[in-house]
């Protein structure tokens, strides 16, 4: 059992993770004595080679919340199948809560045409040519998770 934990930590250290903070929000919890302030950080981690994850961290200060978000993001990493032109193999829809997202592959040289949280997720996944459209919700967290949902449902076709 000790060996498995050691292997997990070694694997984590070998991969060069890049992390970007999507949003930091001040949230409150109402308790008997008044309001308790804390911070919620939404963080995306990825290696720009097909692995990406979204994490959420909450703490009483911003830096701890971001660190917890990075740890959570590394626990929720998915692998994205990329084509030779660094795009996705086919069109896909992602959904999380009220957030809907349409992801379409695009021609080489087109770039990442996306906004907000989906753009950060797609760039950290290593996708270079893609079109995306957000529908429904404006929530950064839900749109990031809808992007992850869409990317996790991608399939590659073997002829």
From Swiss-Prot:
Alphabetized Gene3D superfamilies for the sequence: 3.30.160.20, 3.30.230.10
Subcellular location, principal: plastid
GO molecular function: rRNA binding; structural constituent of ribosome
Keyword RNA-binding in record: yes
Keyword Chloroplast tagged: yes
Domain of life: Eukaryota
Localisation: Plastid, Chloroplast
One CC-aspect GO term: small ribosomal subunit
InterPro entries linked: Ribosomal_Su5_D2-typ_SF, Ribosomal_uS5, Ribosomal_uS5_bac-type, Ribosomal_uS5_C, Ribosomal_uS5_N, Ribosomal_uS5_N_CS, Ribsml_uS5_D2-typ_fold_subgr
GO biological process: translation
All copies of domain S5 DRBM, residue ranges: 17-80
Record-linked Pfam families: Ribosomal_S5, Ribosomal_S5_C
Keywords per UniProt: Chloroplast, Plastid, Ribonucleoprotein, Ribosomal protein, RNA-binding, rRNA-binding
Complex formation: Part of the 30S ribosomal subunit. Contacts protein S4.
PANTHER family: MITOCHONDRIAL RIBOSOMAL PROTEIN S5
Family the entry assigns: Belongs to the universal ribosomal protein uS5 family.
Domain remark in the UniProt entry: The N-terminal domain interacts with the head of the 30S subunit; the C-terminal domain interacts with the body and contacts protein S4. The interaction surface between S4 and S5 is involved in control of translational fidelity.
Role summary: With S4 and S12 plays an important role in translational accuracy.
Protein name: Small ribosomal subunit protein uS5c
Protein source organism: Emiliania huxleyi (Coccolithophore)
Lineage of origin: Eukaryota, Haptista, Haptophyta, Prymnesiophyceae, Isochrysidales
Gene: rps5
């Amino acid at each position: 059992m000790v060996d498995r934990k050691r292997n997990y930590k070694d694997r984590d250290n070998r991969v060069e993770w890049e992390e970007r903070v999507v949003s930091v929000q001040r949230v409150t919890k109402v308790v008997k004595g008044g309001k308790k302030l804390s911070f919620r950080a939404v963080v995306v981690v990825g290696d720009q080679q097909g692995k990406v994850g979204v994490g959420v961290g909450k703490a009483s200060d911003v830096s701890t919340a971001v660190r917890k978000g990075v740890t959570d993001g590394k626990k929720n990493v998915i692998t994205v199948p990329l084509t030779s032109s660094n795009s996705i193999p086919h069109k896909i829809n992602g959904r999380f809560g009220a957030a809907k997202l349409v992801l379409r592959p695009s021609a080489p040289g087109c770039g990442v045409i996306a906004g907000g949280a989906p753009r950060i997720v797609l760039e950290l996944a290593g996708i270079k040519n893609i079109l995306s459209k957000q529908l429904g919700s404006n929530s950064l967290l839900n749109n990031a998770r809808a992007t992850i949902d869409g990317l996790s449902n991608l399939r590659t076709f073997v002829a």
